[in-house]
């Protein structure tokens, strides 16, 4: 007998049924929530009350517990409690319960946000509020619906659009036109005007194929280019007879029986990318003596490693395509007249280890000029004028439009958006970190944050960039859609409200095929396993021993380790609240057994100069206070930020020699470049479970996870690691080798650059032959930028030389 199909009950019906069957118990629970008064409750608070009330009889209330475990927050406005329920990643429902009347109702996104706004303004529900909704523009656009498709946008897009575009022979004409449009600075590539039809193309390809099989495979393409021009085929098919034949054969197969995999492979072989612009305006962007400066950390390292790998891949592909073209990559950042001992005041700087990559610095232009560093939170009033100046400088340097513009972080992504819009080129977005995730409730309680951080500008810029861009690169799945228990960075922008400014009812779709996971790696010339003894930089060992163990206290290192035979707990990060270096020190200080097992060495901040960053100043004070409170002298070494990456690589390996571990204790880490660096050196790594490291590390196999919000448990995990490693040294080796295996499989710059090149080709193609430009969305964004962002940016105070800048 066939199984009977039953209707899925709505969330309201399920909750209503639970209230009907257990009214007294649920009244008691929701009354506990209401008795806490007006405000917000987080998931752990909701579950704590449930556990306290039903600890002895949980099974009975399992269906309701499932709902509660999916709740991410609750808004309490007595007698109402509203819940934001996330049954699975990227999917949200909203309900509201009246505790007095036992009434349950479902809410729309707009209704839930309006209810939430009453936390800060009891009259909010009566006001007309601008609502931002991008969903109508994407209603007819293809999107996957399974969570396994997150971050695999290009594969999905190829499958969907291939079937649509290649329905019949006539549908292939856009591909023909795309190939004919290929040129570089006026020089035609791939096809010339001799080919006017698909039949003509196929005929030319077959004639070319017949010729190619008659000559040696290693014949240089330069020997038959002239013959091929007469057929209608220009340069760009390959550098040898074999490679040209492979490319032509691939296209013939596509024309006969199109399929998405062949299309992606073909687009990866034809010349499409010669000039790339990478934007990273804020901070001190240079190749040396800057790491550890305010707003200057992993993003700088990421970009410098990225361009080296990308240039190598571009040169390789250009050679294999049989072209004589010199590529160009420009990293565009702010020129700082007050360069404080760095090269940040130099307009053009060659990137070491490259042939065709430069750092191009463009100053922020104001009426009176501005010389000093400006916090990344204060850059918004300068960016529109900056974009105009950058556009002029790019044309001066490149003499042509770039093929790809890559934005980094919120400011770089906004400038990339304005440039891509102006020049009509493909745009790639890399967030690194979306601040809305790092500062919980910074949207609803905007008034508490905005004067210091100007999040109204930043969140607006983020929305504009993520909806304008052609494709988004993330380092991890978590960036897009989080995990079962935590909300992803981009996912947090689906719906939120900025009271008195606007309400976002649909800000981004995490199922959008523009999302692609492309994970970076570490520079393997700098970071390599400690076991590769012939490559070890032993010349640095005396300096490293001085750094770690000398009895001298100075501006580079504070406090002295009394027992150098212990393994080292090592951590290196910026000194800010989210990186949680002070939290690591407190966790260590509170656990006497951990202090007995290992020394603590942290690299953070700069003892030699007074920070201009207010958050860093506060962390400095807290660090000294904790060291005093927990009597850590003799157990801790606090080292100033280290600028020498090459020596830092050997420092990781030296910590391996002590059988130590690297700990990354951040409250949230978007990716975790230091995690990758440490693992690449073979140093066992124990890192936060919030953000990218949760994905990089397979817990117990390639490292360990800790939760910085539960520091006592985190300390116990460290204790257990060192106890097991002492009792059985093979355990330390197992975690070390597991980390290296994970790196080689997933996190290398070679894999990254290959994927980025392919993505650029595929998205560029689909943008040309379809409505992937999303013109309607871009018109909407133009209005939002002009009418909302500009006024918000204008309200941010301009910096004045001589005054402190920082947050």
From Swiss-Prot:
It comes from the Eukaryota. Disulfide bonds: none annotated. InterPro entries: Glyco_trans_1 (IPR001296), Sucrose_synth_GT-B1 (IPR000368), Sucrose_synthase_pln/cyn (IPR012820), SUS_EPBD (IPR056736), SUS_N (IPR056735). SUPFAM superfamilies: UDP-Glycosyltransferase/glycogen phosphorylase. Highly expressed in developing endosperm and in roots and, at lower levels, in coleoptiles and aleurone. In 3 day old roots it is detected in cap cells and along the vascular strand, starting just after the meristemic region. In 9 day old leaves it is found in the phloem. In seeds it is distributed throughout the endosperm and also found in the assimilate-unloading tissues, the nucellar projection, the vascular area and at a high concentration in the chalazal region. Keywords: Glycosyltransferase, Transferase. Residues 272-748 are annotated as: GT-B glycosyltransferase. It is an enzyme of class 2 (transferase). Its EC number is 2.4.1.13. It catalyses: an NDP-alpha-D-glucose + D-fructose = a ribonucleoside 5'-diphosphate + sucrose + H(+). GO terms for molecular function: sucrose synthase activity. GO terms for biological process: sucrose metabolic process. Coiled coil: none annotated. Pfam families: Glycos_transf_1 (PF00534), GT-B_Sucrose_synth (PF00862), SUS_EPBD (PF24862), SUS_N (PF24861). Sucrose-cleaving enzyme that provides UDP-glucose and fructose for various metabolic pathways. Forms homotetramers. In endosperm it forms both homotetramers and heterotetramers with SS2, all three possible heterotetramers are formed. Belongs to the glycosyltransferase 1 family. Plant sucrose synthase subfamily. This is Sucrose synthase 1. It comes from Hordeum vulgare (Barley). The gene is SS1.
